[in-house]
Structures are given as C-alpha cells and as structure tokens.
Design a protein with these regions (language model features):
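Alpha/propeptide regions of enzymes that mature by internal proteolysis
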Residues: 1-347
Length: 347
C-alpha cells in the first residue's frame, strides 16, 4: 500500500508452510486491522487496532488466551482473558504512557457499539498492548486522544499498511527502525482450509543479535554502523489470530510456540523487554447470552497441533522481518538516526 516491499522481495523465505493470500493476519476471515498515525507537533506515535471477528466482539466473545515471556510491560486486560478464556473488545496497540487513554476510549467505543445493539453493559475488559516509543516520540506529551483510537477502529479493514504506521510509528527494533509487521500461514485439515496470522509491534533487541532466516544480518550491520551502548531492551507485542478451532488452553500452547519466531530473529528477552502474546480464534465463541444453555466448542486434535505450532512460529518470525523491512529511516528525539533494514539488504 505504501510502495514498500516485504522481506520475501529481498530473497528471504521464512519457513516452509504456505502463507495466506495477502500474507497478513487479515487472511483469517473476519479479522480486520486499522491504524491511526499521530504526527502533529513533532509526535511520532499512534494506535493500531485488531478486530478479531465480524459483529459485536463484546457479544460474541471469541475464545482467547495470553502468554508472557518477560513481563516488563503495561498491557491492560490480560488478567480476565487468562481467567475466562475469552476476549470481549478489539485489541488496541499504542505507546506505554497512553495505555490508560486508549483503554478509556475502547470502553467508550464498546459502550456505543453495545448501545446500537440495545445492550446495556456494566463491565468491559478493554485489551490494550504497548511498547515504549520514547527514543523517537516525545512520549511524555501523551499525544493519543479518543478520536485517534476511534479512527483506528473505524478504519479497520482487510488491507492495511506495515512499517512506520499506527502503534509502530515510533518504535525501534534491534537498533533499526521497527514498526508494525504481519504474516500468515494456511493448512488443510478434514477438507477445510484454516488460517493463522500474526501481527507484531516490534520494539526489542540488540542490533548485533538480529537474525534474518538464520543469517547474522544484524552483526554485519553493526560492523558498519558501530552502535554504542547496545542493549536487549524495549518490548514486543505479538497478536495471533486464527480460525482454527482451539480451546483457550490450546491457544496458550500455540502462543508459547509463537515465541520461537521471536527467538529466531535474535531476541534474548532481556530484563527491560516486555514480550507479550495475545491470541484468539474466531471459530469458537463463548457468549454471555443464553445462560440457561450449555455452551460447546470444537477443538483441533491435540496430536495434530505440531503444524499449528510451526505456523505460529513462522508467522511471527516473518512478521518481525516485515516490520523492519517496511519501516523507513527516522530521526530520534535526541537527533540520532535510526536506519531501516532495507538500506542494508541488496534487492
């Protein structure tokens, strides 16, 4: 959409499982993604919204799970997902100091959405993830407002940009400009095609550790740029969406394997890195309505999950690579230049 090329255009092919039609998380039917990039008055931040299913998420409540590798983060809403195994709002990503403001906007959005369906809500669990974009964005000014969140939600569609957009506008990954990235994988089972996709907000890692398809690309870049005080800190938000029928317990198993994709790009999950995974399946729902009825869901056979694990790992690895390759060079708040990966990869 912005004319940039994905990591495959540079000759790198992540894994062996086929990708979806657009190689995006929105290859999963019903999933939509929207951005609002905030660039007024020197700000370089924003909001990215992931809508997990068609219709009212609060009413439908897709099965969901969460997993944290290193908990240096301020993500909102994960406690209830852990307890109940469902998600009841879209997932919004932003910067660290705007979690509260985005959460408030997401509550208001959900109230209005439910009012349109003649539902009066008393409790809402807004889900908001974050990374710290203060190297590039004046984060203390907390520039994100309600209308930015609503714009991201209302603009959500199957086609969306990657790189320096939305919540990825000000992120730094492995000493290079990070951003939003996505990828997907498909499998055929019992006569049906299923899709799993990943979306990341990359803001982690040391330049020297960056790996692309097993190649020490970051080390080669570091020999050219000579980074100072390189640390494995920052964060990454990883969203996994699928239409594979899974239970919340199975989803957590998938999220744990998604971490393989993060490690393969060079993360050592340092002290200051928040590594948070949120997953959902829009094949299974546990709605609150119909309290006098038993609820049932379908589940993938446990002994057939190996391929699903690999789908998650490959999707995350490629999504991180795409977040870097779609990004463009940026100047930080202290004047430092953050180069982009595409500067160092021959086409």
């Amino acid at each position: 959409m912005n004319g940039a090329k994905d990591i495959r255009s540079y000759g790198y092919k992540v894994g062996s499982i086929p990708c979806g039609k657009a190689n995006l998380i929105t290859d999963v039917p019903g999933v939509k993604v929207g951005h609002c990039t905030v660039e007024e008055n020197g700000h370089k931040t924003g909001v990215t919204a992931v809508i997990p299913c068609d219709g009212n998420v609060f009413v439908k409540k897709p099965v969901a799970s969460v997993f944290t590798l290193n908990g240096y983060g301020k993500t909102a809403g994960t406690i209830q997902i852990e307890e109940l195994g469902v998600i009841e709002t879209p997932i919004c990503l932003t910067n660290t100091l705007n979690v509260g403001k985005v959460s408030d906007a997401l509550v208001e959005y959900t109230i209005q959405k439910c009012a349109g369906d003649h539902i009066k809500v008393r409790s809402i669990n807004p889900v908001v993830g974050e990374t710290n974009d203060s190297l590039i964005n004046p984060i203390q000014e907390r520039a994100v407002e309600v209308h930015h969140v609503i714009q991201a939600l209302e603009s959500a569609s199957e086609a969306f940009e990657q790189g320096c957009v939305g919540a990825g506008r000000g992120t730094v990954c492995c000493g290079l400009k990070g951003g939003i990235g996505s990828s997907s994988r498909v499998l055929d089972f019992a006569g049906k095609t299923y899709t799993l996709g990943a979306l990341v907000q990359s803001n982690f890692g040391r330049m020297e550790d960056l790996m692309i398809c097993g190649q020490p690309v970051g080390n080669r870049i570091a020999q050219e740029l000579h980074p100072k005080n390189s640390k494995d800190e920052g964060s990454i938000m990883i969203i996994i969406g699928t239409d594979i029928p899974l239970s919340a317990r199975q989803l957590k198993r998938v999220l744990k394997r998604a971490a393989v994709g993060l490690v393969r790009t060079g993360s050592y999950m340092g002290h200051g890195s928040g590594d948070v995974f949120i997953g959902f399946t829009n094949e299974n729902y546990l709605p609150a309505a119909g309290k006098e009825k038993l609820l049932s869901i379908s589940c993938f056979p446990e002994d057939r999950l190996d391929l699903v694990f690999r789908m998650a790992a490959e999707s995350v690895e490629e999504a991180i690579c795409n977040s870097l390759i779609y990004a463009h060079q940026e100047t930080g708040v202290d004047g430092k230049i953050y180069h982009c990966l595409s500067e160092f990869l021959p086409e």
